[in-house]
Regions:
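Conserved glycine-rich FAD pyrophosphate-binding loop
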Residues: 30-31, 41-43, 65-204
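C-terminal substrate-binding/cap subdomain adjacent to the FAD-binding core in PCMH-type
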Residues: 1-90
Length: 204
C-alpha cells in the first residue's frame, strides 16, 4: 500500500532492477482499487503495488518496502489462494471497471523510459479523473520497462484521439485496442503474419 502515486513508480522500478525472480509487477491507482472486488480493496484505500515472485524474493521485496516506508503484505502462495492478484491485473482490471460502469474503456502503451512520471503528471493535469492509471512491469529486449493500461472515461473518438496524441508527443508507444486494422494497433505497418492471424481469428 502506498499513499503517494509518484512513489509507487519509483518502488516498482526499484523492484524490477533488483535481484528478484519477479513473475508479475503492477500498480493500480486508488480509484481503480475502489472498483475492484471486496476481497482485494477491503483493507485500505490507497494505491497498490502488486508483486508476484518466487518465495526467495519476498525478503528482498519486504526490505525495499521498508526502505520506502510503505506497508508490505504477503498474501501467500498463488495456487493456494482463493483469490490471487492475477484476478485484478492485465485485462481483468478493465473488465472489473466495466462491470460497474460500461463507460470505461482502456488503452495500451509502452511508457517513455525514465519519463513515465512526466507523462502521467501531464495527463493528470489535463484530463483529471478521466484517465486512471494501471501500470505493469514488462521486459523490452531484456530491459525492464513500464507499460500502461490506463482506464479511460469514454467521451467519444475525438477525445480518445487527443489523449493518444498527448501520449505520443510525450514519448509513449500506443497500442490502440479500438481499431480493426493491424497497422492501426501500434506497429503502424502491415505485418503479414499478424494479418494472417487476424483473418483466422476474427469473427466471420
Amino acid at each position: 500500500d502506498c499513499i503517494e502515486f509518484e512513489k509507487t513508480i519509483e518502488i516498482l522500478k526499484t523492484l524490477t532492477s533488483a535481484a528478484i525472480d519477479m513473475k508479475l509487477g503492477a500498480i493500480l491507482e486508488d480509484e481503480i482499487v475502489d472498483q475492484m472486488p471486496k476481497w482485494f480493496n477491503s483493507n485500505s484505500r490507497s494505491h497498490k503495488i502488486l508483486i508476484q515472485s518466487t518465495l526467495g524474493g519476498t525478503k528482498t521485496i519486504e526490505l525495499i518496502c521498508k526502505k520506502f516506508k510503505v506497508e508490505f503484505t504477503l498474501l501467500g502462495e498463488e495456487e493456494k489462494l482463493v483469490n490471487g492478484i492475477s484476478e485484478v491485473v492485465w485485462n481483468h482490471t478493465t473488465l472489473h471497471m466495466r462491470s460497474r460502469d460500461k463507460n470505461w474503456t482502456y488503452l495500451q502503451m509502452l511508457l517513455p523510459l525514465n519519463n513515465e512520471l512526466e507523462l502521467i503528471s501531464f495527463l493528470r493535469k489535463k484530463w483529471g479523473r478521466k484517465v486512471l492509471w494501471h501500470l505493469e512491469a514488462v521486459s523490452q529486449q531484456g530491459s525492464p520497462r513500464l507499460a500502461a493500461l490506463p482506464v479511460l472515461r469514454w467521451n467519444g473518438i475525438n477525445e480518445l484521439n487527443e489523449i493518444m496524441e498527448d501520449c505520443k508527443k510525450l514519448g509513449a508507444f500506443i497500442f490502440n485496442p479500438h481499431v480493426l486494422t493491424v497497422e492501426g494497433g501500434g506497429l503502424g505497418v502491415v505485418d503479414a503474419d499478424q494479418v494472417k492471424a487476424k483473418l483466422k481469428f476474427d469473427p466471420k
